[in-house]
Amino acid sequence: MNQDQRDKLARVLIDEAYTCSERGDTDDARTLLRQSVAVRFRDEIEKIIKGDVKLLNIFTDMQHDKDVDRRVMARALIHVLIEDKRFLEKYKPKFEIVEDQEETKWLNQEINL
């Protein structure tokens, strides 16, 4: 699958995430959002898993960006990484999962626009 195809699939997944959020299914919405990020940023995720600490730092810093979309995307990407066994083997001592309500707020804001 090339990048253009991945971008289209990621867009479909994010649209479905909004649909799930509209009907109040936040767990599915959150899962679809993370799948969308995993598809769209597949190459970046693989680079991070292989040890690209500079790229990892970019995404960890982006979690505190002023732009809500960038912040939520970065947090979703970090969650995707944390769920990957290869990533955990390399970085587990440095990362842990923290419950995040911002993804749900972000999905709800996008729907209300």
Q: Whereabouts are the PLM-identified features?
A:
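Acidic, low-complexity, intrinsically disordered interaction modules
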Residues: 24-27, 36-95
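Short amphipathic alpha-helical heptad-repeat segments
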Residues: 2-14, 45-55
